[in-house]
Every structure is written in structure tokens, then in C-alpha cells.
A protein has these predicted regions:
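Glycoside hydrolase catalytic-domain context in secreted enzymes
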Residues: 1-185
Length: 185
């Protein structure tokens, strides 16, 4: 059950009732991680349920912390325009500190996709179309999020997405991608 990952109970549009047995499954050790849990009240509640399982393996909580957690910073594309790697590392560090305080263990950031089409709806999550700048920013943001992983204010960074995800045909998210050598190189 440790590979099962569930979402939280709330979304911006209201309550989510996909799995009414979620709490019982956590107690049984059938869930290993959860996404989009908002605040220490809920992370603590779910963690206490996990400690009632036979093996007492804690849950991992993940959240998209793309440009801040409670403090909102400029979107990654705007930060990239500054070329200020120290500032980007600092904003990731602050976001990690806030997220960790809320019980979040890992973030799905930074996005390292190279944007090819301005119509793509996720351009703002990354550093744009420059591979050199994108690699430098990814390094700075991972360093900011993770710092020293022994520090309670750090969160694990998970770079995303798959190769060529940012080259979706027609700029349509989740669309086909031309992964031929000609297009990738």
C-alpha cells in the first residue's frame, strides 16, 4: 500500500468525495502519500491515522509549490527574466520553509521543460526556452528547496516533467509531442 497516493479532501471548487474510505485505508497502511493537503491541522490528522497502522510508516505529503507556499513570489518565468539565481534560490528556500512548517515533505518543482510554443498553458511554470538558463535556475531552485535535507525546513524537490513535455503539439497540454531526433536536437 505504500505506493498508493491519494489527493486531499478539498479543492478550490469545494469538497472532494472520491474515496469515503480514505481514513480507514490510512489506518490499514494502504496509503503511502497524499497530495494537496492544506495546513498542519490536516497533515497532523492524517499522520496520526498512519501511526495507527501496523507498521507505523509515516505518510509523505506533496504539494505543487511553484512560486511560493503562503508567500507568493513572481512566477518562475518572471524570475527567469531577472537572471538573479541567488534570488531564485532564496524564494525556493522561503517556500520550502513555509511548506515544511505545514507538514509538506516534497514539492513538484522546479519545472525544467523547455517551452517551444507560447500557446502552451504551462509556459509560466518554467524558465522559458533557454536551456542554459533553465539548467542554472533548476540547480538554484533545487538547492533552495532542499538545502540540507536533514534540516526540518527543507522539502524534497522533484523536477518535472518528461522529456519534450514542453513541446506539446499546438501548445495543447497533454497533447502529442514530436520526439524525433530532429525536433529534440
Amino acid at each position: 500500500g505504500q505506493l498508493n497516493q491519494y489527493t486531499g479532501d478539498n479543492a478550490a471548487t469545494g469538497p472532494i468525495t472520491i474515496n469515503p474510505n480514505k481514513q480507514a485505508e490510512i489506518k490499514q497502511g494502504l496509503i503511502g502519500s497524499m497530495l494537496n493537503i492544506l495546513g498542519t491541522k490536516y497533515t497532523r490528522q492524517y499522520q496520526e491515522l498512519a501511526m495507527q497502522s501496523r507498521l507505523k510508516i509515516p505518510l509523505l505529503f506533496g504539494q505543487d509549490v511553484i512560486h511560493g507556499y503562503k508567500t507568493t513570489f513572481p512566477i518562475p518565468l518572471a524570475e527567469a527574466a531577472s537572471w538573479d539565481l541567488e534570488a531564485m534560490e532564496l524564494t525556493a528556500r522561503i517556500a520550502a520553509t513555509e511548506a515544511a512548517a505545514a507538514g509538506i515533505h516534497w514539492t513538484f518543482a522546479p519545472m525544467v521543460d523547455i517551452s517551444r510554443d507560447p500557446r502552451w498553458g504551462r509556459v509560466m511554470e518554467g524558465a522559458g526556452e533557454d536551456t542554459y538558463l533553465g539548467s542554472k535556475i533548476a540547480y538554484a531552485r533545487v538547492k533552495g528547496f532542499q538545502g540540507n535535507l536533514g534540516d526540518v525546513t527543507s522539502v524534497m524537490a522533484c523536477v518535472k516533467h518528461f522529456a519534450a513535455y514542453g513541446a506539446a503539439v499546438g501548445g495543447r497540454d497533454y497533447n502529442s509531442v514530436d520526439m524525433s531526433n530532429r525536433m529534440l536536437w
